[in-house]
């Protein structure tokens, strides 16, 4: 879904059929279009984004923090642990916003998804993860809007009480 959301192309076109497909996309995407028009890009995100839009494979020692790279995502702070706290993630995003001044900034959380897989939809842990992310967004939203950003918030593609998305996920 990450590839489709940021490229606007269907799965059969970009070829990312599961999270296990290790590939750097070679089609237009939000990051490349921003750069094509003179903008700067940044991501505080799961390492998949670095692989999808910059290069493969992700190397913890070299790729975790990338500032002012020459790749599709100019600056990134990437994590690989599904339970990476949203408090850290949003701090990473704010660091990038304040210090790199991107025209397009992606902040991608895995915390809600992680709790959903571990405890299922409707669980106390899942609902708490949603609330934590909601509070952080509510606190940061005025700063982002005052800085001239347009905000788009997307959500996961659903999860059931057993912690499964459906499809090929388990």
Regions found by a protein language model. Give the residues of each.
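Feature captures the catalytic ectodomains and active-site-proximal regions of enzymes
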Residues: 1-170
